[in-house]
Amino acid sequence: MGVVAKDTGTIAFELRRHIDGLVYRFDKASDATGRIGFKRSDGDYWIIWHEELRWIAGSWDDEEVFGRPWDQSKRQSETSPPEGIWVSRKGSKSYVYDLIHVETP
């Protein structure tokens, strides 16, 4: 995937699922090769900067996209994913989330 490592100013954010209130936390992290993104706290799930698609939920080494901001017309900074509505796809299901930047202690 056309991914570029970026150092980001945001340290953490949450994806809050509309249908049931489930919250996923993502923290700034780097993978084994030093690529910087945001890793979900409960598994190897990433939100990363893609050179063409901008911020996506996806894999470093695969072209599959699992989620992205709903409003693609919004200007996106390379340093942190945009707050607002995100949508995801898992198999035949889709979910709507709010991405909220959070402060860390």
Where are these regions (language model features)?
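Interface elements of modular peptide-recognition networks comprising either
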Residues: 1-105
